[in-house]
């Protein structure tokens, strides 16, 4: 028996956050996933963070300098929890004893529209 596809009215509404990341060490997409999850778990505990439906959709490496490495990413979360995710991302300041800065540069309803905020 084939499973039926959920109609749009019953699907979860997602929002996509464009993130700007500056860190003093080299990170990968998997490291960013860990950074985001640990930041949200520290601020909202596991019970609240499980509802966020966090997912790193895209990860871009922009530049490497002597002082820092610059990355940008697109993060998916549920519409109802956008403010909570942004708050927990703002509180991230260390990763592996290195300074890190994560800021939100844009918010959108689709990935295509969110890519307008990303520098390539």
Give the positions of each predicted feature.
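The conserved glycine-aromatic submotif of the RRM
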Residues: 64-74
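A common structural junction motif
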Residues: 40, 91-100
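Intrinsically disordered, low-complexity regions enriched in proline, serine, glycine
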Residues: 48-49, 85-87
